Structures are given as C-alpha cells and as structure tokens.
C-alpha cells in the first residue's frame, strides 16, 4: 500500500488545522472501482439528457469522463499525487524576493463543475530553505486539480509554501476567468477575478509589498 510523503502529510495537516482543506470524505475504494461507478452514473446522466449512448461519438463518453475525473482533472483530491518536493538549504544566503510568474491554472468551479482558468504569480523570500522552481508550478497544479473555489485555491498554495519553506514570507496572486460567469448565468464575457494572499514581510513591509504588487501589475499589463 502506498503511503503519503512527509511533505504531503505536513501540507494536508496544515490545511486541516486552518480549515482550508477541501470538503473531502474518506472513501477507501480502489480507483478502478471508482471509475466504474462514475461511468455508470454518467450513463444515467446522459440518458436523462436524452442523449443516444449508442451513437458512435457518445459510446465511450462515460468511460472517458470517469477516467478524466479520477486520473486527471480531480487527481489533486488524492495526496498520493502530491508532487515530490525538493527543499534545498539556503547556503547562498538568498534574502531577496524570488518570483515565478505566469503559472498556468486550469481548475473546475465546485459550484457548477465548469472550468475556470488563468495565471498565478508566486513570490517568497527565503529563510533557511529554498525550493526547486518547478516544484512551485507543481504545487499550483496539484491544488488546481480539484473542484475548487479560487479563494480557497489561493490560500492553499499560500499555506502549502509557508509550511514547506518554514517561512511566513510568501505572496500569491491569481487572475482567472470563470466560465460559470462567462458561459452561463450572467454571460459576462470580459470580467476576471483576482485573489491575493500576503504573509510575513509581504504584509508588514511596505516596500516589499509594493515590489510584489508592481510585479503582478507588470505581469498583467
């Protein structure tokens, strides 16, 4: 049986403690069985939508959807999929801001199960540790692969990095388009949603806060 990595456990426990974990239940069922159950329910949904499941283009849709849900777009619900994290001692004594911009985000709104997508900017000021740059992208991707709220997603990435890097000096900015607003309801084709999380020096130091805000303004100009 696979076990969670220490980093996955640390992050999950931190989120639970702060009430920031997704509303996930314990379901000790094999992925293959889950996919079979989802496929069965998807057949019922499509039937109720008056779709002909014997048509060539729809015949394998329930199976595709089940596989997509479990293995792809909702794979972040399982901490066994938490990325392997490389934390490196800050031997170079880096004390300036490190920023990764234009991180692609594709997630699913948990209210309507429809996509929202956009870009994230992640900054931190190291203390004793630094993190491999690609690991930041992978953490963002992991938490994006869930039924989500943008506000929660922002806070989850924020707290995960604070926990792994053992520093409060983390800042997150996400700009996203929500298709539950664009493709249904009000049908607003142009609005975007911004969310921000600031910690440590990003919150208390005006010049550092200004530098980060300038970075995201430049990034989105």
From Swiss-Prot:
Catalytic activity: GTP + H2O = 7,8-dihydroneopterin 3'-triphosphate + formate + H(+)
Pathway listed: Cofactor biosynthesis; 7,8-dihydroneopterin triphosphate biosynthesis; 7,8-dihydroneopterin triphosphate from GTP: step 1/1
Protein's UniProt name: GTP cyclohydrolase 1
EC number, as in UniProt: 3.5.4.16
Superkingdom of origin: Bacteria
Annotated Zn(2+) binding sites: 109, 112, 180
NCBIfam families: folE, PRK09347.1-1, PRK09347.1-3
Pfam families hit by this protein: GTP_cyclohydroI
Membrane-spanning residues: none
Cellular component GO terms held in the UniProt record: cytoplasm
Keywords, in A-Z order: GTP-binding, Hydrolase, Metal-binding, Nucleotide-binding, One-carbon metabolism, Zinc
InterPro entries assigned to the protein according to its UniProt record, in alphabetical order: GTP-CH-I_C/QueF (IPR043133), GTP-CH-I_N (IPR043134), GTP_CycHdrlase_I (IPR001474), GTP_CycHdrlase_I_CS (IPR018234), GTP_CycHdrlase_I_dom (IPR020602)
Organism expressing this protein natively: Blochmanniella floridana
One annotated GO biological process: one-carbon metabolic process
Record gene name: folE
């Amino acid at each position: 049986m696979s076990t969670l990595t220490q980093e996955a456990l640390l992050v999950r426990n931190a989120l639970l403690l702060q009430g920031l974990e997704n509303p996930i239940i314990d379901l000790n069922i094999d992925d293959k069985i889950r996919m079979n159950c989802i496929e069965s329910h998807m057949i019922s949904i499509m039937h109720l939508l008056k779709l002909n499941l014997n048509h060539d283009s729809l015949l394998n849709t329930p199976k595709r959807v089940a596989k997509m849900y479990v293995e792809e777009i909702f794979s972040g619900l399982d901490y066994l999929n938490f990325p392997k994290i490389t934390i490196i001692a800050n031997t170079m004594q880096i004390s300036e801001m490190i920023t990764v911009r234009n991180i692609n985000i594709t997630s699913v709104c948990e209210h309507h199960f429809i996509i929202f997508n956009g870009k994230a900017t992640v900054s931190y000021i190291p203390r004793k540790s630094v993190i491999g740059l690609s690991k930041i992208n992978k953490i963002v991707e992991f938490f994006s692969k869930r039924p989500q709220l943008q506000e929660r997603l922002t806070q989850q990435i924020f707290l995960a990095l604070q926990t792994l890097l053992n520093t409060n000096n983390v800042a997150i900015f996400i700009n996203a388009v929500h298709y539950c607003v664009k493709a249904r309801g009000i049908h607003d084709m142009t609005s975007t949603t911004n969310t921000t999380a600031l910690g440590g020096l990003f919150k208390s130091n005006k010049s550092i806060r200004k530098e980060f805000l300038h970075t995201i303004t430049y990034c989105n100009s």
